[in-house]
């Protein structure tokens, strides 16, 4: 289950439709060292989930440094449709 009370959102497609205010106001505590982040909006993700800090859209399904934009394709340094898998990739801005 994810943190911020968004674990019941279902899939990651289309953002976090069912969470609404749950992500907006409920991100203060209780997230701890989250190991799985799913369906978080960018604000919730960046302020609450250490494993997703620096997201630029979409969601994080594994503890990664940066989520790529939905339009991001493979850029040859750890990026794919979902997330950037390497810190250096995000820093080089080859996807995000």
Curated annotation (Swiss-Prot):
One GO CC term on file: intermediate filament
Taxonomic superkingdom: Eukaryota
Region entry 14 X 2 AA repeats of CG, spans: 4-80
PROSITE patterns assigned: 4FE4S_FER_1, EGF_1, TNFR_NGFR_1, VWFC_1, ZN2_CY6_FUNGAL_1
Keyword Repeat among record annotations: yes
Keyword Repeat: yes
Keywords: Keratin, Repeat
Job of this protein: In the hair cortex, hair keratin intermediate filaments are embedded in an interfilamentous matrix, consisting of hair keratin-associated proteins (KRTAP), which are essential for the formation of a rigid and resistant hair shaft through their extensive disulfide bond cross-linking with abundant cysteine residues of hair keratins. The matrix proteins include the high-sulfur and high-glycine-tyrosine keratins.
Note: Human have a similar number of genes as other primates despite the relative hairlessness of humans.
Family: Belongs to the KRTAP type 28 family.
The protein's name in its UniProt record: Small cysteine and glycine repeat-containing protein 7
Organism whose genome encodes this protein: Homo sapiens
Gene: SCYGR7
């Amino acid at each position: 289950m994810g943190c911020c009370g968004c674990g019941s959102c279902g899939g990651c497609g289309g953002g976090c439709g069912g969470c609404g205010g749950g992500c907006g106001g409920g991100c203060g505590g209780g997230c701890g060292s989250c190991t799985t982040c799913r369906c978080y909006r960018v604000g919730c993700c960046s302020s609450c989930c250490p494993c997703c800090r620096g997201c630029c859209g979409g969601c994080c399904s594994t503890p990664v440094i940066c989520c790529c934009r939905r339009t991001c394709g493979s850029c040859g340094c750890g990026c794919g449709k979902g997330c950037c898998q390497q810190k250096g990739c995000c820093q080089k801005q080859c996807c995000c």
